[in-house]
Amino acid sequence: MWLVEANGTVIRSYLVSGKYRTPAAGTYSVFSKSRHTSAGHDGITMNDMVRFARGSRLAIGFHGIPRDRYGRPLQTEHDLGGFRSAGCVRQSDGDAAFLYDWAPIGTTVVVLH
């Protein structure tokens, strides 16, 4: 993933995990943010959620590595870079916090496959 300023300067790049071809390639816009949220099932929680697309049931966004009801991570940062999610884009917790602070509502998101 690349974080790119309006002038084209890449300010940060890093590995993420997502779901194959989800969301569809295209241009989106950040429409909602939450420091702490849940997946709505199984007690799974995520930090630094930045929502930019709509899924069939829930919004799709960037967030830190999800945790189960006991606080255990669902994957390690070492595992980032593969298909490991139900639709959202997982980042390291540090990268998720940076993106949360960097991207205000309305920020353009371009998804490539």
Q: For each predicted feature, which ranges?
A:
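Exported/periplasmic cell-wall-interacting domains
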Residues: 22-23, 34-113
